[in-house]
Swiss-Prot record:
<dbReference type="Pfam" id="PF12090">
    <property type="entry name" value="Spt20_SEP"/>
</dbReference>
<comment type="similarity">
    <text>Belongs to the SPT20 family.</text>
</comment>
<feature type="compositionally biased region" description="Polar residues">
    <location>
        <begin position="502"/>
        <end position="513"/>
    </location>
</feature>
<dbReference type="GO" id="GO:0045722">
    <property type="term" value="P:positive regulation of gluconeogenesis"/>
</dbReference>
<dbReference type="GO" id="GO:0006282">
    <property type="term" value="P:regulation of DNA repair"/>
</dbReference>
<protein>
    <recommendedName>
        <fullName>Transcription factor SPT20 homolog</fullName>
    </recommendedName>
</protein>
<feature type="compositionally biased region" description="Polar residues">
    <location>
        <begin position="442"/>
        <end position="451"/>
    </location>
</feature>
<feature type="modified residue" description="Phosphoserine">
    <location>
        <position position="515"/>
    </location>
</feature>
<keyword id="KW-0217">Developmental protein</keyword>
<keyword id="KW-0306">Gastrulation</keyword>
<feature type="modified residue" description="Phosphoserine">
    <location>
        <position position="296"/>
    </location>
</feature>
<feature type="compositionally biased region" description="Polar residues">
    <location>
        <begin position="477"/>
        <end position="486"/>
    </location>
</feature>
<feature type="modified residue" description="Phosphoserine">
    <location>
        <position position="520"/>
    </location>
</feature>
<dbReference type="GO" id="GO:0003712">
    <property type="term" value="F:transcription coregulator activity"/>
</dbReference>
<dbReference type="GO" id="GO:0000124">
    <property type="term" value="C:SAGA complex"/>
</dbReference>
<dbReference type="GO" id="GO:0045944">
    <property type="term" value="P:positive regulation of transcription by RNA polymerase II"/>
</dbReference>
<feature type="region of interest" description="Disordered">
    <location>
        <begin position="419"/>
        <end position="530"/>
    </location>
</feature>
Length: 530
């Protein structure tokens, strides 16, 4: 099947090419009158036999213009005026002068659509029949299109002319049948059908009934060559630049913008206003300008007196809490709190270590992911740990502050995981002593510090969630590193010597190494509010 179609296409190409180069001559009856189609064909054969004046050019074109010039056929004149003048129709009278009958704006383009399709408009049938000169040629009408839109001289404008053949359609044939049968005679339905068939035979083009695929391919090829630039997408593009479309755009530009485009209109006007502004900026040559900044006076005299109270800032001392005296431990005490939670598809297990070293009254904390193989490493005190581990420990303060840190971290993990949290506690350091020795040791180790007892109270910094942690869409919990970054001190814990006496006063350098957040009363008030 595909091979037969390919052969038919090749045959159609050969027929079209041979008809353009050497069209065959037709024989007509001597008594018969030639129709306009036969005249056009004879003119086509005649032009093909002539040699072109310029090579690569053909003479068998513009046949309708040549036929009108040879036989002076009557035509329907259509004038296309520039701008908003519209278009008009003219008919020729008996005296040979043309008279304008209809003038319409470009917005009413129904007649132009019929002219573009080379079809006879049904609304002009009655007007053309009443014309003083016979304008019909075998049911067709020759229209001359005079285009004045490309003329530059408005006083005596010239025009570009071309001719088209308006063919009758079924709608015009129905109008003809109705006008013929509207007299006083009685027409039966059979008479009307017979009249319609005769009109179709008289106006229709020759029909080829050869049952060959090549005939259909040839007809399609000829139709394509004639209508290749008359497709719907091309018409849509042309309508954007038609006179009616340009007039509509011009009217909209002068009128007020719709409510939906007020912002666009404002931006467009502001852009035009800025484009119209011109700034006369001139850069003078070097040496011609005066530096006013260098010429301004500069007073650099040293003041004799300085108001210290105006620039100084007094920091209030931290009030002491005598209800809980500072305890000097007799040994290292380490408490491990393991928090386990499982939310969704994730499992989290972190460990909070609270440590009080020997000879140090302060508690330190460390948060890390829990691992079984790190049990030995976690037993090291911050004073004996390496320099790399100092950044992981943060200062907590007293025992009450350590309990508060545990509660806050448990609430933090539970809020982030949005599920119940299991906490397990294990302590080391004091378990090696007997109950009696532990009581005696605690009694002898409870000593007030000469410095810390005078109003120094260490409070842990408040635990705050990061701004984006609560809105995280990934579902990750608050990690140990994030919590430790909010709890740890910017300074590492002090390294206490084992030989330091418990009765001696605390060195002032140790107090200065505490974080400002841990010592400030503002952080303590924020923690109580949280």
């Amino acid at each position: 099947m595909q091979q037969a179609v390919e052969q038919a296409l090749d045959c159609a190409e050969y027929i079209v090419e041979s008809a353009q180069q050497r069209p065959p001559k037709r024989k007509y009856l001597s008594s018969g009158r030639k129709s306009i189609f036969q005249k056009l064909y004879d003119l086509y054969v005649e032009e093909c036999e002539k040699e072109p004046e310029v090579k690569k050019l053909r003479r068998n074109v513009n046949l309708l213009e040549k036929l009108v010039m040879q036989e002076t056929l009557s035509c329907l004149v259509v004038n296309l005026y520039p701008g908003n003048e519209g278009y008009s129709l003219m008919l020729r009278g008996k005296n040979g002068s043309d008279s304008e009958t209809i003038r319409l704006p470009y917005e009413e383009g129904e007649l132009l659509e019929y002219l573009d399709a080379e079809e006879l408009p049904p609304i002009l049938v009655d007007l053309l029949e009443k014309s003083q000169v016979n304008i019909f040629h075998c049911g067709c009408v020759i229209a001359e299109i005079r285009d004045y839109r490309q003329s530059s001289n408005m006083k005596s404008p010239g025009y570009q002319s071309r001719h088209i053949l308006l063919r009758p359609t079924m709608q015009t044939l129905v109008c003809d049948v109705h006008s013929i049968t509207s007299d006083n005679h009685k027409w039966t339905q059979e008479d009307k059908l017979l009249l319609e068939s005769q009109l179709i035979l008289a106006t229709a083009e020759p029909l080829c009934l050869d049952p060959s695929v090549a005939v259909a391919c040839t007809a399609n090829r000829l139709l394509y060559n004639r209508q290749k630039m008359n497709t719907r997408p091309m018409k849509r593009c042309w309508k954007r630049y038609s006179r009616s479309s340009l007039n509509r755009q011009q009217d909209l530009s002068h009128g007020p913008p719709p409510p939906q485009l007020r912002l666009l209109d404002f931006l467009q006007k502001r852009k035009e206003r800025k484009a119209g502004q011109h700034y006369d900026l001139k850069i003078s040559k070097a040496g011609n300008c005066v530096d006013m900044w260098k010429r301004s006076p500069c007073n650099l005299a040293v003041p004799s007196e300085v108001d210290v109270e105006k620039y100084a800032k007094v920091e209030e001392s931290i009030k002491s809490d005598d209800s809980q005296p500072t305890m000097w431990p007799a040994h290292d005490v380490k408490d491990d709190y393991v928090f386990e939670c499982e939310g969704g598809n994730q499992y989290q297990k972190t460990k909070l270590t609270i440590l009080q070293s020997l000879g140090d009254p302060l508690y330190y904390g460390k948060i890390q992911p829990w691992k079984a193989d790190e049990e030995n490493d976690s037993q090291m005190s911050p004073s004996h740990s390496s320099a790399d581990d100092h950044s992981n420990w943060f200062v907590i303060g007293s025992k009450t502050d350590a309990e508060r840190v545990v509660n806050q971290y448990q609430e933090l993990v539970q809020n982030e995981a949005k599920c119940p949290v299991k906490m397990s506690h294990s302590s080391s350091g004091s378990a090696a002593l007997s109950p009696g020795e532990e009581a005696e040791q605690a009694e002898t180790s409870s000593i007030q510090s000469s410095v810390l007892g005078k109003g120094v109270k260490h409070r842990p910094p408040p635990i705050k969630l990061p701004s984006g942690s609560g809105n995280s869409s990934s579902g990750n919990y608050f990690t140990a590193q994030q919590a430790s970054s909010f709890l740890k001190s910017p300074t590492p814990p002090p390294s206490c010597k084992p030989s330091l006496s418990r009765k001696s006063s605390v060195d002032l350098s140790q107090v200065s190494m505490l974080s400002p957040a841990a010592l400030s009363p503002a952080s303590s008030s924020q923690r109580h509010e949280s």
